[in-house]
Amino acid sequence: MVSRTDRSSSSTSKAVTSSPSTSSLSSAASSPSVSSSSSSSSVSAAGMTAVSTGPLTGSRKTWLVGADPDLRVPMREIVLTTGDTVVVYDTSGPYTDPGVTIDVRRGLPATRDSWIAQRGDTAPDERRTVPGTGASGPGTLGSGTPGSGTPGSGPLGLGGTDLDGRVRVPRRAVPGRPSITQLGYARRGQITREMEFVALREGLPVETVRAEIAAGRAVLPANVNHPESEPMAIGRAFLVKINANLGNSAVTSSIEEEVEKMVWATRWGADTVMDLSTGSDIALTREWIIRNAPVPVGTVPIYQALEKVGGRPEKLSWEVYRDTVIEQCEQGVDYMTVHAGVLLRYVPLTARRRTGIVSRGGSILASWCLAHHEENFLYTHFAELCEIFAAYDVTFSLGDGLRPGSIADANDEAQLAELATLGELTQVAWEHDVQVMIEGPGHVPMNKIEENVQLQRELCHDAPFYTLGPLTTDIAPGYDHITSAIGAAMIGWAGTAMLCYVTPKEHLGLPDRDDVKAGVIAYKIAAHAADLAKGHPGAQAWDDALSDARFEFRWADQFHLALDPDTARAFHDETLPAPAAKSAHFCSMCGPHFCSMKISHQVRAHAGGDGLDPAGHGADPAGDEAVTAGLREKAAEFNAAGNRIYLPVANS
């Protein structure tokens, strides 16, 4: 949702605001090559990098309040020098609210706890505690890796307790009661607090939110064990969302870095994050991210399951995977990528590909299928998996394990065979009232992008589409945030509901904090461009505000309205750093004499002097007379020249 107001206008919703940020403070982590945003550092556990806090430059926190004053939806309000404000969708959570003291050791406030408890259809499972860092055993969650630590060990001394030392008991559905999923509620005609929150946030009627979820065209990922998250919806009828991937690897990164990446990604606009950790301390890293995440968190459980069996795909089993999924459900993972469509008979279809199987999860399960010459255990146990997801309201993100990894492989037989199977599994999940979205490619040339969306809608019954890019060319390592943002904008316009970001490090290495920002900004541009093309209500208000500021040479407002205010200001100040340049009617591109907008103002002033409006029509009777007199003058010139249409060229 984007709205524009002025100081004299009245609003139908109450709003509470905090002070705008006017200074540029140092960020939590050093970034020598990129100017940081106006952020400060929060208090953190000993030895842990502080996370970024504070409002974006020129912005302040505001809240939309509906009929129920207890329901407050956070937004970002950009304050302009004219006294107007522009209110935009905000994913940053409490980290940009100067009135909140952030301590990552305690996690974020569990805002949804009371909503969940009041429904009375879930209860704490006293047999379980969260999290554990040692080997798994009855009643204890953990990575299950021998030697990975014991309760109380690890870099931050956690194990079997919540981040602030309290034992946390996970919730699950009360047996015998109706479905506790947002899909179940929506189908029964019940409007939840989460749906009300989304309606305010998107600027849509709450009945639209309920109906889209009930039809399976949208998902509202909201695990009952992640009460810290701020509800959001993913679907064609809503703003296009973006996801940012995080997570360590066996080679690099740490828990501290991944928590800061999560905060940094949501600061710049990530609607969800996925923890794709494959290195050490997978469970502990995930716990820290979830407890501090204001957005839904997704995972790929097969990664942790593989770690439990020593990294050997052939040693995997349904039992190991099932226990891993339950552990992650109890921690609060909101959606999980499940590669249940990688069937044994589809694996040979990839043999003639230029780049084979490029999905990590897809390759792991293909390897298992070939090692045992059995059908994928995620496919054969899918109904049981649905029952587990339904107990916690976890959303399926049905993985495209056979997605194309190169332009040459786009829309091939393997990709489309798996897509048809995902459509089959979608209906199975819906029978269990489990929410579903479908993952898509990948690497797709522009001429095949719309076809991908049409096939997905047809084969997967209009379930929301969630795509990685797609990259529209393979020739630009180091710039794949650009090659993929092109495809992302196009596929978002065609109907994709969420775009998984790609960073400049794609295909090259693990992204750092700067890469995360570059990827998020690129994808926010793509998503917003798609919203504009779709004609989403209110999407253009932000563009119009910036266009006005640009035409009126309000430089400070241009900076503040930018997706990245600090970079916009830094680029301007590289050549015109003086304070006087902030009121100049030109920039260093055209200089004082060739600025098209300055000349346009002069043309308007001249037209206005003749009583004309900017379009050249009479703004008043005197203006009409000026137009008539001008036409008569030109007619007289034509007659004086002998009524000739073509005149000889004059010699110089």
From Swiss-Prot:
[4Fe-4S] cluster binds at residues 587, 590, 595. It catalyses: 5-amino-1-(5-phospho-beta-D-ribosyl)imidazole + S-adenosyl-L-methionine = 4-amino-2-methyl-5-(phosphooxymethyl)pyrimidine + CO + 5'-deoxyadenosine + formate + L-methionine + 3 H(+). Signal peptide: none annotated. Residues 1-45, 118-166 are annotated as: Disordered. Keywords: 4Fe-4S, Iron, Iron-sulfur, Lyase, Metal-binding, S-adenosyl-L-methionine, Thiamine biosynthesis, Zinc. GO terms for molecular function: 4 iron, 4 sulfur cluster binding; carbon-carbon lyase activity; zinc ion binding. Its cofactor is [4Fe-4S] cluster. Pathway: Cofactor biosynthesis; thiamine diphosphate biosynthesis. Its EC number is 4.1.99.17. It comes from the Bacteria. Transmembrane segments: none annotated. Residues 134-162 have a biased composition (Gly residues). PANTHER family: PHOSPHOMETHYLPYRIMIDINE SYNTHASE, CHLOROPLASTIC, THIAMINE BIOSYNTHESIS PROTEIN THIC. This is Phosphomethylpyrimidine synthase. It comes from Frankia casuarinae (strain DSM 45818 / CECT 9043 / HFP020203 / CcI3).
